[in-house]
Regions:
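N-terminal catalytic or cofactor-binding beta/alpha core of small enzyme domains
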Residues: 1-122, 127-138, 144-149
Length: 149
C-alpha cells in the first residue's frame, strides 16, 4: 500500500461538481504522482472508499465547493467547517464523511486528511466543466502534488 492517497470526488453529470474527478484523472496520468500515491475517483461518496483510506499516512480529497468564493479559486484546508452549509451533490460533505469515519473507527489511520477545494459558481445537472473551473484544474493538480513529498 502506498502511503498517500488522492481521492477525486464528484459527479460528472453535475457540471462543475466533477472538478475533483478531473483533477484525479489528470494526476493518475502523472508518474511523478502515481509513484508515491494511489489516485482514484470516489464518485460522490467518500464512505465507499473507507477500506482503501485506512492505513494511509495522508489522504488528499479533491472536491468542488459552492460557497460564494470566486469560481476557479483553489483552496487547501486541513478541515473544512462542518457547520457551514455545503452546496454540492453529495448527501454528506467530504468533511462530514471523514468525521463519521473517525467516530465509527477510532483507530482510523491516516493521521492527516487534507482537502483541495475548487470553488465553483453552481452545481447543476449538465455535462462538462465551466471555463473558470476547467482553467483551475492544473492549479488544483499542482496543489495536490505539493502535498505529496
Amino acid at each position: 500500500m502506498k502511503p498517500f492517497a488522492v481521492l477525486g470526488l464528484g459527479n460528472s453529470l453535475m457540471g462543475d461538481d466533477a472538478a475533483g474527478v478531473a483533477v484525479a484523472e489528470m494526476l493518475a496520468r502523472d508518474p511523478t504522482v502515481t509513484d508515491r500515491a494511489e489516485v482514484w475517483t470516489a464518485g460522490a461518496d467518500v464512505l465507499r472508499s473507507m477500506d482503501r483510506i485506512d492505513g494511509r499516512e495522508r489522504v488528499i480529497l479533491v472536491d468542488a465547493v459552492e460557497c460564494g468564493e470566486e469560481p476557479g479559486r483553489v483552496s487547501v484546508v486541513d478541515q473544512p467547517p462542518l457547520d457551514r452549509p455545503h452546496g454540492h451533490a453529495h448527501w454528506l460533505s467530504a468533511a462530514e464523511a471523514v468525521e463519521l469515519m473517525r467516530r465509527a473507527m477510532p483507530g482510523l489511520r491516516p493521521a492527516k486528511f487534507t482537502w483541495v477545494l475548487v470553488h465553483v459558481a453552481s452545481i447543476k445537472a449538465q455535462e462538462g466543466l465551466s471555463a473558470e473551473v476547467a482553467a483551475a484544474i492544473p492549479a488544483a493538480a499542482a496543489a495536490v502534488k505539493a502535498l505529496i513529498p
